[in-house]
Swiss-Prot record:
The encoding gene: TIGD4
One cellular-component annotation, GO: nucleus
Stored PROSITE patterns: HTH_CENPB (PS51253), HTH_PSQ (PS50960)
HTH CENPB-type domain span: 75-146
Main location: nucleus
Domain DDE-1 stretches: 174-375
Similarity section: Belongs to the tigger transposable element derived protein family.
Domain HTH psq-type: 12-63
InterPro entries, alphabetized: CenT-Element_Derived, DDE_SF_endonuclease_dom, Homeodomain-like_sf, HTH_CenpB_DNA-bd_dom, HTH_Psq
Protein name as annotated: Tigger transposable element-derived protein 4
Region (Disordered): 434-472
Length: 512
């Protein structure tokens, strides 16, 4: 009997549905493969094809990153990211901090915060709709539950919470080379040891002291591999000693009080942001919560992290040892310059330009070891590997004090070089509501300050008689003298190359 022919087109088509795995299951698969289990057995166990397993292993880094950073709910099956990535990261960071502080968060509060972050980040077209909020909660696995009654009465130490929960969140997101801290400090840039006890603890000195004060802003990264250019804030935009200069080794700003202001801070942050953008880097900069440190909108490469006001200065890395090291080195140089004047029977003068050059020199000399130790003492423990640096630099000031005493510099009895360097640590450095008595006033000529300066000096410490800028031929002659001196010493290749660079630069200039 003939068999009836069957038309294949009439048969029902069975399509096997592709199995979707959650991120959690993909993590289990990755662990199984790396433990040595056969891929065929793993594929059979999870009901997937071998090429699907290969695809999971190919995207292993993305899966692990999403799982470890809690950017997605582990039960989710796809790693579809959001359009407003920076907004979502900021919102999730805020949510995690609220959780740490036992602050109950609900939908309306999250919507309000999302709109607030959108405005600060420059997303003017963003509106937090119910649909967007639902998708956001789904992406991150957020479920709002009523807070247990007993939890509301538990006392929380904000400082402990910040160290245990908030700081590690940042350190997990950023490599130590991209974690920065900045800090202001006041400096009486011409203060020699004479009569220094009269100035200890002053917050806004008067008269000549006020005139001779500047604010420094120092900043480094966490692993000590990078120091931000010093920001120096003086009183005059173009002091006498800067006349004719087109460049300085530091960033320089000026205002009446020589303080950090919100405008100066924002301008500086935007300048740094451009530099980090050019390097294609993302960094976090920790700053104190001051009116002079506003939130700066639309930064592309910098995330500003503000220390809670409840934290003490011990959490500020720059305060632990970096500023101390810089000031000790600076005081060393200042006294040495004075000693040189005494030995040469010359009147000692020290201008703001001298201070800027000296600060740049000393800033370069602050070691990575000192920086790393300062961060560790401030509680910054790297989540990406422990530091192997145990000892910071040690400044030896005993010989310097002895030399200074021998040359006639009066060190008050018991005053160490460290104490001398720290005498201006309490100077105000940021804009605030000033007390009328602390505003700088004019000092009479009869006031004694212990400064070795003459009455002919300008406010910036430079001599009243203007000296002409050297010509190109004079610069070449000076360089020849410098080369002869250096080549009589044991000079390395780096200095030889630097001399060649200097000569090429001078020769490239048009004659004046």
């Amino acid at each position: 009997m003939a068999e009836a022919s069957v038309d294949a087109s009439t048969l029902p088509v069975t399509v096997k549905k592709k199995k979707s795995l959650s991120i959690e299951e993909k993590i289990d698969i990755i662990n199984a493969v790396e433990s040595g289990k056969k891929k065929a057995e793993i594929a059979a166990e999870y009901g997937i094809k071998k090429n699907s397993l290969s695809s999971i292993m190919k995207n292993k880094d993305k899966v692990l990153e999403a799982f470890e950073s809690l950017r997605f709910d582990p039960k989710r099956k796809r790693l579809r990211t959001a359009f407003y990535t920076d907004l979502e990261e900021a919102l999730m960071r805020w949510y995690r901090i609220a959780q740490c502080l036992n602050v109950p968060v609900n939908g309306p509060m999250l919507r309000l915060k999302a709109n607030d972050f959108a405005q600060k980040l420059g997303h003017n077209d963003f509106k937090c709709s119910n649909g967007w909020l639902d998708r956001f909660k789904s992406r991150y696995g957020l479920v709002f539950r009523a807070q247990p009654v007993e939890a509301t009465g538990v006392p929380v130490d904000p400082s402990t919470v910040w160290y245990q929960n908030v700081l590690p969140y940042y350190l997990n997101d950023y490599h130590p080379k991209n974690v920065f801290n900045i800090k202001e400090t006041g400096l009486l840039y011409r203060m020699l040891p004479t009569n220094t006890f009269a100035f200890k603890g002053e917050t806004c000195s008067v008269g000549k002291l006020c005139k001779d004060r500047i604010t420094l802003v120092v900043g480094t990264n966490m692993d000590g591999s990078e120091k931000l250019p010093l920001l120096v804030i003086g009183k005059k935009r173009t002091p006498h000693c800067f006349k004719g200069l087109k460049s300085l080794p530091v960033c320089y700003e000026a205002n009446r009080m020589a303080w950090m202001t919100s405008d100066v801070f924002e301008q500086w942050m935007r300048k740094l942001d451009e530099e980090f953008q050019a390097q294609q880097r993302r960094v976090v900069i920790f700053v104190e919560s001051f009116p002079a440190h506003p939130e700066v909108k639309n930064l592309k490469s910098i995330e500003l992290a503000f220390f809670p006001s409840c934290l003490s200065s011990k959490c500020i890395a720059m305060k632990q040892g970096v500023i101390k090291s810089l000031k000790i080195k600076y005081r060393h140089c200042l006294i040495k310059k004075f000693l040189s004047s005494v030995e040469g029977s010359k009147e000692f003068t020290f201008s703001l330009l001298d201070a800027v050059d000296t600060l740049h020199l000393c800033w370069r000399a602050v070691t990575p070891e000192t920086i790393v130790k300062s961060y560790e003492e401030a509680g910054f423990k790297s989540q990406k590997g422990e530091s192997d640096i145990t000892n910071a630099e040690k400044d030896t000031g005993l010989d310097l004090v002895a030399d200074a005493l021998g040359a006639g510099v009066e060190f008050p009895e018991g005053l160490s070089i460290e104490e001398y360097a720290a005498l201006d640590d309490d100077l105000e450095t940021c804009e605030a509501a000033p007390n009328g008595d602390s505003i700088c006033t004019k000092e009479s000529k009869s006031d004694e300050t212990g400064f070795y300066t003459s009455d002919e000096e300008d406010d910036d410490g430079s001599p009243g008689t203007e000296l002409p800028l050297p010509s190109k031929s004079e610069a070449i002659t000076a360089l020849d003298t410098l080369k002869k001196f250096l080549r009589s010493q044991d000079m390395n290749d780096g200095l030889q190359n630097s001399l060649a660079d200097l000569e090429n630069f001078i020769n490239s200039l048009s004659p004046k």
